[in-house]
Amino acid sequence: MARIAGVDLPKKKRIEYALTYIYGIGLKTSRDILSAVNISLDKRVQELSEDEVSLISKKIQESYAVEGDLRKKVTMDIKALMDLGSYRGLRHRKGLPVRGQTTKNNARTRKGKRKTVGSASK
């Protein structure tokens, strides 16, 4: 089993899809990496040699932010928005949708379960 960027890649999958198991690498990025190091998209992970795995690993390290580094960067970007006091930062702080979605009836994913208000009977 190949291990790249701290992630065990599934053996039987094609390498272009297996690389998408790494946080921060999608299908297009995966294909770009493989074309840069001249590895066929049809190869399975179990068919890769150690040299090919190290080539892929080196390319990812030098060109892309993945896994922990990327998660840390996203967290820091959100924290910076909150510290600035921007509208987006305030929405993050309040746990509400950030990108303009309506919140009168929806937004349950961000707001959580409904809170009961008032009493049921008089």
Curated annotation (Swiss-Prot):
GO CC annotation, single: small ribosomal subunit
Gene Ontology terms: biological process: translation
GO molecular function: rRNA binding; structural constituent of ribosome; tRNA binding
Presence of the UniProt keyword rRNA-binding in the record: yes
Region (Disordered) residue spans: 93-122
Keyword line: Ribonucleoprotein, Ribosomal protein, RNA-binding, rRNA-binding, tRNA-binding
Composition-biased stretches (Basic residues): 107-116
Stretches of the chain forming a coiled coil according to its record: none
KW Transferase (keyword) present: no
Function: Located at the top of the head of the 30S subunit, it contacts several helices of the 16S rRNA. In the 70S ribosome it contacts the 23S rRNA (bridge B1a) and protein L5 of the 50S subunit (bridge B1b), connecting the 2 subunits; these bridges are implicated in subunit movement. Contacts the tRNAs in the A and P-sites.
Family: Belongs to the universal ribosomal protein uS13 family.
Subunit structure: Part of the 30S ribosomal subunit. Forms a loose heterodimer with protein S19. Forms two bridges to the 50S subunit in the 70S ribosome.
Identification of the protein by name: Small ribosomal subunit protein uS13
Source organism: Wolinella succinogenes (strain ATCC 29543 / DSM 1740 / CCUG 13145 / JCM 31913 / LMG 7466 / NCTC 11488 / FDC 602W) (Vibrio succinogenes)
Highest classification ranks of the organism: Bacteria, Pseudomonadati, Campylobacterota, Epsilonproteobacteria, Campylobacterales
This protein's encoding gene: rpsM
